[in-house]
Amino acid sequence: MAAQVEIEDQESVTNLDNGEIINPISDNAPNFSGDATILLREATFEHNLIKNCFLSGMGSFATETTIVTVRKILTQRLITTKAKFAVFKLFTEAMKRKNNGYANIRYGWYSGSKEEIDRVITYGFSNREIKKVENDVGSHGVGIHLVHHRYSLAAALVGEGDEEGIKNILLCRVILGKPEQIVTGSKQSYPSSNQFDSGVDNLENPRKYVIWSCNMNSYILPTYIVSFKSHLLRGLIGRARSPCVSFSVLMSILSKSLDAARMNLILTSYDDFRKRKLRREQLVRKIREVVGDNLLFKILKNQRR
C-alpha cells in the first residue's frame, strides 16, 4: 500500500503555481483543454506529491493502480483561468472576513468522464454536474460533491473510463468556510442559514464535501488532473460488456463469505439495480459499505488469476 501522504491544506500546494518542467505528451496520454494544462514530469516533487496523495487514498487498490499522467491546470496562462483564480482568491478573502480570518480551504477529488472534466476546466461546473446527484438516495444534498483528498478510492470508483480503461479525476481546492452536516438522502440544495457555507457528511471526520450550486464556480478551483488505470476497478464498474467479474458472479461469491443479514442488504440493492432503480456506481457503493474494500479487493484480484 502506498505510504500515507498529506497535502497540507490552505497554502502548501498553492505555492506551486510557478509551473513545472514538463514531459513531451505521449501518444496515449489524455489531452485536456489545450493550453489550460501542462503535463508534469515524472519524479519531480509536484508530480510525486499529487501521485502519492492519490495512491495513498486508494487503499488495497493502490498496488493494482497505474498512474498514466498528472496534469496541472495553469492559473496564469489564459484569461479565463486567470479570472477563475482571481475569483477564488477574492472569495477566499471574503470567507476569511466572514469567519474570523479562517476560510477553511481543503483539497477534494472530483471524478467524471474525460469529456466532463474537460468541460469543467473550460467552462466551469454547471447544472449537468448537479443532476448527477439529484436522484441519488446516497447523496448528501444536491450540489457538487467532492471527496476528501485522503479518500481518493471513493471518487475513483464512480469515475467513467474510456475505451482503454483510463479514468480521470480532478484534485480541486475547495473553500468550505463553516460547513454543516448533511444527512444521507437529503435534498437540501443551499445553506440552511447564513451561518453555514457548505456541507459535509460528518463534522468530526468528513469524507465528502458538498458545495451548493450558487457557489460552485466561486468555492471550487480545479488544480490537477490525475489520469490512471486499474484493471480491478475497470472490472467492477466498467461497461457491462467487459467486466472481469459480473455482478451475478460477485453475488455468488459474496454469498459464501457474508452472513444472511449483510447478503440480504446487497441482494436488495442488486434487485433495485436490475430494475434500474439504482445506477451502477450506487450499487458499487452499497457493496463497498457492506463488504468492505479489503474483501472486495481480494475477490476481484482472485478473479483476474
From Swiss-Prot:
- UniProt name for this protein: Probable inactive poly [ADP-ribose] polymerase SRO3
Q: Where is the RST domain?
A: 238-305
Q: Give the multimer and partner information.
A: Interacts with STO.
Q: What high-level taxonomic lineage is stated for the organism?
A: Eukaryota, Viridiplantae, Streptophyta, Embryophyta, Tracheophyta
Q: Which cysteines are cross-linked by disulfides?
A: none
Fetch the Pfam families from UniProt: RST
Q: Where is the PARP catalytic domain?
A: 23-249
Keywords from the named record: Developmental protein, Nucleus, Stress response
Task: Write out the annotated subcellular location.
Answer: Nucleus
GO CC, sorted alphabetically, is: nucleus
Q: Name one GO molecular function term.
A: NAD+ poly-ADP-ribosyltransferase activity
**Gene of this entry:** SRO3
* Coiled-coil features, chain-numbered ranges: none
Question: Which stretches are transmembrane?
Answer: none
- Tell me the function of this protein: Probable inactive ADP-ribosyltransferase that may be involved in stress and developmental responses.
**Which InterPro entries does the entry mention?**
Poly(ADP-ribose)pol_cat_dom, RCD1/SRO1-5, RST
